[in-house]
Amino acid sequence: VEVAFVRNGKLVRVERVVPEGVEQELHALRELVQGPTRLERRQGIRTAIPEGARVRAISADGEVWLTSFSRSLLGMGAPETKVTRLAQIAATLAPLGDQEYASVATEGRLVTSLRLGMRPDVWRAETGENDYQYVVRGIQLRLWLLGYLDRTDVTGSLDYSTEQALVAFQGWEDLDRTGTVTGQTQIALSTAARPEPTAHRPGKRIEIYRDRGVLLMVDTGEVVRVVHTSTGAGGVTPVGAFRVYVKALMSWSVPFKVWMPYAAYFTGGIATHQSPDVPSYPASHGCVRLPEGEAERVYRFVDVGTPVVVR
């Protein structure tokens, strides 16, 4: 394998022999944190990885390397030094498989996510619970890879779209739905997988999980989007298998005297629709409330006849 170090401010690769029976990716990262040999140092090769850093875990999940290091990896150091550390990790992992991204955690808590083959962004970290750091853009990139956010919403700003994505993620993972980057959220993000639907069938379908407050958009057995939702208070949204029977860009609710944008009705007078109030608990009179932006996405996704499963 090749390990990425630094010489004269540029990344250089040095070869390491992988012992028999050891996974190449694990050995590569172990060699990375161990640093250059004495001979390599005499040749001007250095590393930005701090002495004493350790590899905790590495595994592959589809197109993503999931990595975890000791907390010291991103402890002391100037912002540019931390960017170089991440660049060394990315450059070491890039040749080892078909993965295009890497998530980087410390002690099992996600810090950031990287696009392999590209230099990491400027280090702008927030301080979370117990002083564990995280990079907002890296959190957003991870949420996008898991199906909770648009790629265009990876902006580095904790905005409304990111808050809704976090609530959806927390609901699916059975965490407190705060819409913020809690410690438990960092832990879950470090190893989470994209949600799986209940059935892998051809065509499009919608799955709604009342207790989790989550709607899954499923296309040919793959979850293409995970959306935060609020269903009926007291469990009044019926459980069962239904189909969309009518769509309306703007529907008027006669009993509640309110407009419901992007309504897709699937049983009785119950529909998915946009709402300005989508709390992290069941609060509606039976309909499936969706956040601004997500409601239109669901509306465009479904057709009359699209299956809707409520659980």
Model segments located where?
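Exported/periplasmic cell-wall-interacting domains
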Residues: 93-104, 199-201, 235-241, 246-311
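Bimodal "functional hotspot" detector
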Residues: 1-138
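A mature extracytoplasmic/lumenal domain signature
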Residues: 7, 59-62, 69-73, 106-108, ...
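Short acidic, glycine/serine/threonine-rich helix-capping segments at coil-helix boundaries
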Residues: 129-137, 141-188
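Extracytoplasmic/secreted envelope proteins and their assembly/folding machinery
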Residues: 26-33, 52, 83-90, 136-143, ...
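Cell wall/extracellular polymer interaction/catalysis modules
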Residues: 158, 167, 171-235
